[in-house]
Amino acid sequence: MALNDFHVSEPYTLGIELEMQVINPPGYDLSQDSSTLIDAVKPQLTAGEIKHDITESMLEMATGVCRDIDQVAAQLSAMQHVILQAASEHHLGICGGGTHPFQKWQRQEVCDNERYQRTLENFGYLIQQATVFGQHVHVGCANGDDAIYLLHGLSHFVPHFIALSAASPYMQGSDTRFACARLNIFSAFPDNGPMPWVSNWQEFAGLFRRLSYTTMIDSIKDLHWDIRPSPAFGTVEVRVMDTPLTLDHAINMAGLIQATAHWLLTERPFKPQEQDYLLYKFNRFQACRYGLEGVLTDVYTGDRRRLADDTLRLLDNVTPSARKLGADSAIDALRLQVKKGGNEAQYMREFIADGGSLIGLVQKHCEIWAGQ
């Protein structure tokens, strides 16, 4: 199958997708009523899109093309308002978090959508298990070769993005001992983790053609890589973040990725090579397991350094770019988060340690998303 040409887009523009949990009080399990909410809110939208995801307990908020994080905030806030209003009218809750802490995957209903039904046929129960919730950030690129360079550059910081956004310590009623357990769900997929090595857009087109020989890949959307190019949009899409508990944190993560993209494409600090990925999965695991307390290993020198320290270094490196893009408030907020030493997974564990229940935790998450 041939790949679409890379659509030229304005560099560093943003598009954000948030996969939200649809909750059924008073038990606070996942609901199967996302279709009801989507039908209710679609006529009220003035920007962005609200749509189905894999199962009926998921709802996706997607912005249009945004110039900066202020536009991202405006679009997401407007969508949040209409979703919360409709959820209240239908006696449902909405919340973030990368996993629901006690839902059972066997109960999840796959959406009546041709693509998702085909995916269910290919992957079986793995698709129901993929009822997990992430934030995806698209960054605009001028051409396909820039997109491949940007993908490789951003891959250096996948552990940092995971650690900052980690919000999935509980799954199936248990503490997983991971800060981000969500990404483990995809480990059985044949296209999990980093994209196979290519050095330019022409090589990527050849890779996609070969992947399509499997008959499991009809479009870029069928690939579950941590970061993937999206030629139809003219973007690179970062897919490793858990959905945050607050809109503010989602906006901060978008600002970081935008600023990092600007720094990478203007400074070109790396010369990508295949060896860069030799320890990729080990460093990714450290971020998933331990969050900001994880330890990164340099593939070339063997040096080991705390992920928190390296994240502060990243934030310093991208600060000038953030100022140019109007994203410096996001960098400042994330720097404060790292210095305080926490992420949302840590907050969740503290809630339980203080005597809270998993049901109470989901209730609290719904209140946080509603701004209560």
Swiss-Prot record:
Keywords: ATP-binding, Ligase, Nucleotide-binding. Signal peptide: none annotated. Pfam families: GCS2. Its EC number is 6.3.2.2. ATP-dependent carboxylate-amine ligase which exhibits weak glutamate--cysteine ligase activity. Homodimer. This is Putative glutamate--cysteine ligase 2. It comes from Salmonella typhi. The lineage of its organism: Bacteria, Pseudomonadati, Pseudomonadota, Gammaproteobacteria, Enterobacterales.
